[in-house]
UniProtKB/Swiss-Prot annotation:
Gene: truA
Record organism: Nitratidesulfovibrio vulgaris (strain ATCC 29579 / DSM 644 / CCUG 34227 / NCIMB 8303 / VKM B-1760 / Hildenborough) (Desulfovibrio vulgaris)
Superkingdom, natural source: Bacteria
Assembly, per entry: Homodimer.
Active site: 57
This protein's record includes keyword Isomerase: yes
Family: Belongs to the tRNA pseudouridine synthase TruA family.
Biological processes annotated in GO: tRNA pseudouridine synthesis
Classification via InterPro entries: PsdUridine_synth_cat_dom_sf (IPR020103), PsdUridine_synth_TruA (IPR001406), PsdUridine_synth_TruA_a/b_dom (IPR020097), PsdUridine_synth_TruA_C (IPR020095), TruA/RsuA/RluB/E/F_N (IPR020094)
Keywords annotated in UniProt: Isomerase, tRNA processing
PANTHER family, A to Z: PSEUDOURIDYLATE SYNTHASE, TRNA PSEUDOURIDINE SYNTHASE-LIKE 1
Pfam families tied to this protein: PseudoU_synth_1
Name of the protein described by the UniProt record: tRNA pseudouridine synthase A
Amino acid sequence: MARLRLTIAYKGTDLHGWQVQEHATRPRPRTVQGVLEPIVSRMAGEQVRLHAAGRTDAGVHADGQVAHVDIPDHKLGVDWQKAINAQLPDDICILDVRRAADDFHARFDALGKRYTYRLWLTRRFIPPKLHGQVWATGPLDVYAMDRAARHLAGTHDFAAFQNQGTDVTSTVRTVHAIRRCPSGTLPAGALLTCSEPYTSWRCTGTHPDQPPATAGHPLAGIGLELVWSFEGDGFLKQMVRNMMGLLVAVGRGALAADDVPGIMATLDRSRAPATAPACGLTLSEVYYPPCDYPYAR
């Protein structure tokens, strides 16, 4: 048998996550694994199982999901990427297929992951191409969010940011970097550029303690897509969405940035704000050795 490594992108809007739901009543919910495995099995001539780096939830997107699968040696000559893509629906795409070491594991060999979360800072109008891919929050105090994010970076017990559903031996995780970056929808001359990791905070063009936008400010009164990036060695169930929910609560003024350490110290999920919607979240990249991941162990 030979092991293949697949890099996969998908729009999660009409998908019920990655994992096939074998015990669900028929018709089974449509999942990424449930779509891919029958195709790859037919091509391999036998039943196969795909193992992913992370099991994304319903509605979550990916442009850098990684999975591995074992196929018979005599099938190595097949153009797997082209052949699989020819059979896929429009919301799933294979970006790359390559042979991997026999002991490569998409989940356990990962050094870290990067997730992105997209916010739309007005509720008045969302461009059609962004429907199902952003959280329309309305205006936010991004500078207060910056201050709150600094409390989340680093190694902490994130029990207050874990939803139930997955057994883990420890809720301690390391968030190496949280950054916010404006997308191409920002107006010319806007103040924000992609920030440095909060572990070594530096804000380009403005100070993180600057007051929120007011009338006439480049960030005020306009529709903006704002992208947050979270990098870490691993994340608990819905941890990124829960951190995003907290940051938005701070941005709306429902919490103060300095409330974050106290919430984290409770280790109590009920003390943290509600989970952010799945629609804004994307699994953007999974890092494996050898690579230039700056936080490699």
